[in-house]
Amino acid sequence: MKNESTFIDVPAESSSAMKGKAPLIGVARDHTTSGSGGYNRGLAIFDFLLRLAAIVAALAAAATMGTSDETLPFFTQFLQFEASYDDLPTFQFFVIAMALVGGYLVLSLPISVVTILRPLATAPRLLLLVLDTGVLALNTAAASSAAAISYLAHSGNQNTNWLPICQQFGDFCQKSSGAVVSAFVSVVFFTILVVISGVALKRH
């Protein structure tokens, strides 16, 4: 009977062995979580680098437009022919808007760093998605309105008798056109940033 009791105790040991296998399942889940975290961290690093590039594009657009000023070498007794960004309200709006876009991007860098350090955190990524979408709209509005005025400066409008001025004010038009191109580059960067935030949130 003692030998039989000894054989009865064997299933108890096997059940404890089965309990010992339970942590292996938890370890497998941890590997899955760490894999997702590594993917999101890679997206966060790319997000940070894109923000640096967008800062350069936005501030370059504001600075270039803000310094677009040209005075023709000839003048009359009563008139001096000059073209400047502050002569056009649309270009004034462009300078202010792009400066705000650049300032926002600088302030968003710490939040982007948080997403690198905590790749699985949802709140900072969601905050960036909402703010980036709003600033993207402002950036697009500034770039589009300035592009329309720049087109009129180059081509004019025969229906309204608006004459092109870029033949006379070549430097002014070149600077303003460069600023518009830089602003649209910033729009592309912002679009990618919004997509990155959406993908990262979907991975959660």
Swiss-Prot record:
Main location: membrane
Annotated S-S bridges: none
Side Extracellular, residues: 64-92, 147-178
Gene Ontology cellular component terms for the protein in this record: Casparian strip; plasma membrane
Residues in the Cytoplasmic compartment per record: 1-42, 114-125, 200-204
TM segment ranges: 43-63, 93-113, 126-146, 179-199
An MF annotation (GO) of this entry: protein homodimerization activity
Subcellular location: Cell membrane
GO biological process: cell wall modification; cell-cell junction assembly
Pfam families noted in UniProt: CASP_dom
Keyword entries, A-Z: Cell membrane, Cell wall biogenesis/degradation, Membrane, Transmembrane, Transmembrane helix
Xref: InterPro entries: CASP/CASPL (IPR006459), CASP_dom (IPR006702), CASPL (IPR044173)
Membrane topology, from the record: Multi-pass membrane protein
Family: Belongs to the Casparian strip membrane proteins (CASP) family.
Subunit relationships: Homodimer and heterodimers with other CASP proteins. Interacts with CASP1, CASP3 and CASP4.
PANTHER family linked: CASP-LIKE PROTEIN, CASP-LIKE PROTEIN 1U1
Purpose of the protein: Regulates membrane-cell wall junctions and localized cell wall deposition. Required for establishment of the Casparian strip membrane domain (CSD) and the subsequent formation of Casparian strips, a cell wall modification of the root endodermis that determines an apoplastic barrier between the intraorganismal apoplasm and the extraorganismal apoplasm and prevents lateral diffusion.
The protein, known as: Casparian strip membrane protein 2
Record organism: Arabidopsis thaliana
Taxon lineage: Eukaryota, Viridiplantae, Streptophyta, Embryophyta, Tracheophyta
Gene: CASP2
